[in-house]
Amino acid sequence: MNPITLAIIYFTIFLGPVITMSSTNLMLMWVGLEFSLLAIIPMLINKKNPRSTEAATKYFVTQATASMIILLAIVLNYKQLGTWMFQQQTNGLILNMTLMALSMKLGLAPFHFWLPEVTQGIPLHMGLILLTWQKIAPLSILIQIYPLLNSTIILMLAITSIFMGAWGGLNQTQMRKIMAYSSIAHMGWMLAILPYNPSLTLLNLMIYIILTAPMFMALMLNNSMTINSISLLWNKTPAMLTMISLMLLSLGGLPPLTGFLPKWIIITELMKNNCLIMATLMAMMALLNLFFYTRLIYSTSLTMFPTNNNSKMMTHQTKTKPNLMFSTLAIMSTMTLPLAPQLIT
């Protein structure tokens, strides 16, 4: 692709969520969503992989449907109240339509079915953008309008997403699908605390990005797509395999790694608000999530998949280029809480 065209596309992908976050006008928020949607579609398609075209089509259809629902809600709200922003007088049906559409864009259960399939069919670097940067715009709209939304529906979406994210990742062997289900579960945690403390939603989003980015970078550096390919890293780059194992445990929320921090704070906040049943269910689902990450690490680190060749230690033959960004993010994704425990206070 032409470098100038590529630069324009990436700039537009960056610009869309910025417009949405900085706007108080619903129509401008919608324009920001469309900027990022239309710009990312060409980047999802890989000529060498026909499945990427299918993934891009699924993504476009799902996101376009959600965008139409949001636009319809905005127009109905303007017709009813004569304003481009939701207010206390806004019809509950309009607000529920908007919540459903934003849930589709975020990949929240039960509107999550497109996310694992799309993530599996696109390149790794676009999977990283899809699961991190593309989540910011819809989540920023939710944070702005959450006082008007029905908190019961929000909590139902949250617990369903946490359950589906944990349950869906159990039988997966493809790393991109595992990361997609991880994204669904993390979005559920963000949504669960939104009615009580939106600041914790932002903290959880920031930590989720810190956890997800180095994991995708590790997969890109080693061109690893499956559990089998990761298990073969032990004879090439044992240090990388160790780092991947720690990052997976952090994604699962094992203390004292970084991923434990948001889960700990969110459960504490829910208990302060007398949501004991909700907190208990979320803790149980977190254990299920941690189980499949632990099983994944056991499969890659403590057992060997059958291979056609005799694998020998090749550390002295492997030359890996140092990557400062990956090293920094990997340390942050595992050691932020142990190095700075005052974050929990």
UniProtKB/Swiss-Prot annotation:
Principal location class: mitochondrion
Pfam families: NADH_dehy_S2_C (PF06444), Proton_antipo_M (PF00361)
GO molecular function: NADH dehydrogenase (ubiquinone) activity
Keywords of this entry: Electron transport, Membrane, Mitochondrion, Mitochondrion inner membrane, NAD, Respiratory chain, Translocase, Transmembrane, Transmembrane helix, Transport, Ubiquinone
Localization per record: Mitochondrion inner membrane
Top EC group: translocase
UniProt-listed InterPro entries: Complex_I_Subunit_2, NADH_DH_su2_C, NADH_UbQ_OxRdtase_chain2, ND/Mrp_TM
Protein EC: 7.1.1.2
Keyword set includes Phosphoprotein: no
Reaction(s) this enzyme catalyzes, per UniProt: a ubiquinone + NADH + 5 H(+)(in) = a ubiquinol + NAD(+) + 4 H(+)(out)
Recorded topology in the membrane: Multi-pass membrane protein
Quaternary data: Core subunit of respiratory chain NADH dehydrogenase (Complex I) which is composed of 45 different subunits. Interacts with TMEM242.
Protein name (record): NADH-ubiquinone oxidoreductase chain 2
Species assigned in the record: Mus musculus (Mouse)
Gene: mt-Nd2
